[in-house]
Design a protein with these regions (language model features):
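Bacterial N-terminal signal peptides that target proteins for export
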Residues: 1-10
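Cleavable N-terminal signal peptides
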Residues: 11-12, 22
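Conserved non-catalytic scaffold segment of RNase H-like nuclease domains
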Residues: 29-39, 46-135, 184, 191, ...
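Acidic, Mg2+-coordinating catalytic module of metal-dependent nucleases/exonucleases
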Residues: 129-136, 140-146, 177-219
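Catalytic phosphate/metal-binding cores of nucleic-acid and nucleotide-processing enzymes, i.e., regions
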Residues: 140, 150-154, 169
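Short alpha-helix plus adjacent loop in nuclease-associated cores
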Residues: 160-175
Length: 219
């Protein structure tokens, strides 16, 4: 009898402990799509290693689940260590210190402030799904930047992330390359002109791919 009573108490305590978590997770997007927002994110960096390299810009376009744009933000960022630029990265994004200074680059702390302010303005009380083409790359750099300035990535975005090539893969489009995928979908590829290839052009491309994939789904 004592064992049964203790077990009942334990179950009751666990139920109370996990009730807030269960409430926080519901409702899911299929049940309440109007309670969710997608953050289409793309970043440009000085290299591939977030422990050494830094973001030089970020583009964010927030949409509803149907792909309708809610707002966008572009921030050009002056890295603390521009001398660490990888030449492969420079060929992709055209990073140049003088050009960045002349075109409104801000420091990392100010960039984080703008991103967080925009995020809260766009989301309201809704949950936000981090969405990107190269999701692991964009996630690792945004997480690193936020952490350096006292902001938790987990406080901003839902724990599931969406990567666009996986969405395409599920529809039989197995080209992981953006140029090939844009060809398969019949949409315009992102510019490959280095100085014009920015976080916001990447985010806009991601949104166009997402919308094209939605249009292919059976209704």
């Amino acid at each position: 009898m004592l064992f049964a009573t203790m077990r009942q108490i334990l179950f009751a305590v666990l139920a109370l402990a996990f009730a807030p978590l269960a409430h926080a997770q519901a409702p899911w997007p299929d049940a309440a799509p109007d309670q969710w927002v997608m953050a289409h994110v793309d970043v440009e960096t000085t290299g591939l290693d977030p422990a050494r390299h830094e973001m030089i810009d970020i583009g964010l376009i927030y949409t509803d689940l149907a792909g309708a744009e809610l707002g966008r933000l572009y921030v050009r960022i002056m890295p603390d260590h521009p001398e660490r630029i990888d030449e492969g990265a420079r060929r992709v994004n055209g990073f140049d210190v003088d050009y960045w200074r002349a075109h409104g680059a801000v420091g990392e702390a100010e960039a984080v402030r703008q991103i967080v302010e925009f995020h809260h303005r766009m989301r309201g009380e809704k949950r936000v799904i981090f969405t990107a083409f190269n999701a692991g790359f964009d996630l690792s750099f945004t997480r690193a930047l936020f952490a350096q300035h006292g902001v938790s990535w987990n406080d901003l975005y839902f724990y599931h992330i969406l990567d666009i090539p996986s969405m395409a893969w599920g529809q039989g489009l197995t080209a992981l390359n953006a140029t090939e995928l844009s060809r398969d979908l019949g949409i315009t590829d992102e510019t490959r002109v280095a100085i014009e290839h920015t976080g916001i052009t990447g985010a806009a491309f991601n949104v166009s791919v997402y919308r094209a994939l939605l249009a292919r789904r059976p209704h």
